[in-house]
């Protein structure tokens, strides 16, 4: 008998939460789409606290905004911060009008006792699929389990790492979903996760501690030192990165020698003409009418030096006055993204190695940097055997790369029998205790 519970998928990323219900019907029609919520509590200069996306309606206060995130060192460490964000997310999921979607709930149960498509939702009617970071500390995972069952009271629950859901969202006409090497680069770090028959091969999982957050920090230091002090404008820094940065497609040193040819101008926000800033373009109408006092930022090698850290991590220390002169760091053998991918493939069973190199899938928002795929293919072909195919797939049914795990969760929720086998019910949790989830979901037992 098919499960009657509603399926809710929450991809709990350290930068944004992707959440949504499986709205598919028995005829195979699926209109499921996630909502995206900033996974942070923010404070503007006027002292007002905003939860999730609330700060977006106060664009005049973007300058000097401060973000507090529940993640530290890739681990979900603060449910005191996370829970209000979840309540806000659930309100936005379950409320229909704009006025309702802006409110935050004072308690988890009140967040869930709302209406969705005219139906009353109860936490006991929800089967939750939740993602977490790889190798999260067991006690922190246990804290999450307690929140799920004891605070919210969901009926059933499956917890997994986000990259493990990617094979469920790939285009099987392009990729052999039995052997997928997932490169998941997000806000805090980059993970290399080999999936063999939809199972994680844990001995080969690798981590590169470089992600969007580090790139933002490096860009902030370079611009503040060379041009203007933008250290208190995290939104501006992120906008500049997403608008101007790219990875050298083949030769970083050559681009460095011709950096003046790659210069671009970024118009800084004046909160009159622009709130977030934009790239100055001769064909842009806004650029032709710039006031005389407009501040324009000229960017040269900053555009490609910052994301080059994926392939030359030593750049991080070269641009720091304290560490640049350290002989220990200068002689340290830093491993880049290519090195870790090769190590991951070689740590898998030999028969699967060429299959994994031929089925590489990019996920995570940081892989959207221009030329990421092109450069990575070129670097891998230099390191892997010449008779191996190296294929990287980044377009899966026109799904955004940062949404691949969420859509994978939706597809997994359609596999009712499989989901039943790997999930834990609220009844099981209270019968066996808090450690039961860790025994079922923990990486040591997979």
Curated annotation (Swiss-Prot):
Gene3D superfamilies xrefs: 3.30.420.40, Actin, Chain A, domain 4
Cellular location(s): Cytoplasm; Cytoplasm, Cytoskeleton; Nucleus
SMART domains (UniProt xref): ACTIN (SM00268)
SUPFAM superfamilies membership: Actin-like ATPase domain (SSF53067)
GO annotation terms (biological process): chromatin organization
Coiled coil region boundaries: none
Keywords: Activator, Chromatin regulator, Cytoplasm, Cytoskeleton, Nucleus, Transcription, Transcription regulation
GO cellular component terms given for this protein: cytoplasm; cytoskeleton; Swr1 complex
GO MF annotations in UniProt: nucleosome binding
Region (Disordered): 99-118
One Pfam family matching this protein: Actin
Bias type Low complexity, positions: 99-112
Key word Nucleus present: yes
The protein's role, per its UniProt record: Component of the SWR1 complex which mediates the ATP-dependent exchange of histone H2A for the H2A variant HZT1 leading to transcriptional regulation of selected genes by chromatin remodeling. Involved in chromosome stability.
Subunit and partners: Component of the SWR1 chromatin remodeling complex.
PANTHER family: ACTIN (PTHR11937)
Protein family: Belongs to the actin family. ARP6 subfamily.
Protein name (database record): Actin-like protein ARP6
Organism annotation: Candida albicans (strain SC5314 / ATCC MYA-2876)
């Amino acid at each position: 008998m098919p499960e009657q519970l509603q399926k809710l998928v929450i991809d709990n990323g350290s930068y944004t939460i992707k959440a949504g219900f499986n709205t598919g019907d028995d005829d195979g029609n699926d209109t499921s789409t996630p909502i995206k919520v900033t996974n942070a509590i923010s404070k503007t200069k006027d002292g007002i606290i905003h939860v999730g996306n609330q700060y977006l309606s106060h664009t005049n206060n973007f300058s000097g905004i401060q973000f507090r995130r529940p993640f530290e060192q890739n681990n979900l460490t603060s449910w005191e911060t996370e829970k209000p964000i979840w309540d806000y997310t659930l309100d936005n999921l379950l409320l229909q009008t704009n006025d309702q979607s802006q409110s935050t709930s004072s308690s988890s149960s009140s967040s869930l006792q709302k209406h969705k498509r005219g139906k009353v939702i109860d936490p006991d009617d929800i089967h939750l699929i939740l993602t977490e970071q790889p190798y999260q500390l067991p006690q922190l995972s246990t804290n999450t389990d307690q929140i799920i069952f004891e605070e919210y009271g969901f009926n059933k629950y499956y917890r997994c790492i986000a990259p493990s859901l990617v094979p469920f969202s790939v285009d099987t006409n392009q990729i052999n979903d039995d052997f997928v090497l997932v490169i998941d680069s997000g806000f805090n770090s980059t993970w290399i996760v080999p999936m063999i028959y939809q199972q994680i091969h844990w001995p080969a999982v690798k981590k590169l501690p470089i992600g969007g957050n580090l790139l933002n920090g490096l860009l902030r230091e370079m611009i503040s030192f060379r041009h203007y002090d933008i250290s208190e404008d995290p939104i501006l820094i992120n906008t500049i990165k997403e608008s101007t940065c790219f990875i050298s497609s083949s030769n970083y040193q050559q681009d460095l020698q011709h950096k003046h040819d790659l210069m671009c101008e970024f118009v800084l926000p004046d909160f009159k003409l622009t709130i977030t800033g934009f790239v100055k373009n001769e064909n842009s109408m806004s650029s032709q009418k710039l006031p005389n006092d407009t501040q324009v930022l000229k960017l040269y090698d900053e555009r490609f030096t910052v994301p080059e850290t994926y392939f030359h991590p030593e750049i991080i220390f070269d641009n720091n006055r304290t560490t640049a002169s350290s002989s220990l760091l200068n002689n340290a053998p830093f491993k880049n993204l290519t090195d870790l991918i090769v190590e991951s493939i070689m740590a898998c069973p030999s028969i699967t190695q060429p299959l994994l190199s031929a089925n590489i899938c990019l996920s995570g928002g940081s892989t959207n940097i221009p030329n990421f795929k092109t450069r990575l293919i070129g670097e891998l072909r230099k390191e892997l055997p010449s008779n191996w195919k190296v294929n990287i797939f980044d377009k899966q049914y026109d799904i955004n790369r940062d949404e691949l795990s969420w859509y994978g969760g939706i597809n997994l929720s359609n596999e009712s029998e499989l989901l039943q086998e790997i999930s834990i019910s609220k009844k099981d949790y209270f019968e066996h205790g808090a450690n039961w989830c860790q025994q079922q979901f923990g990486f040591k037992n997979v």
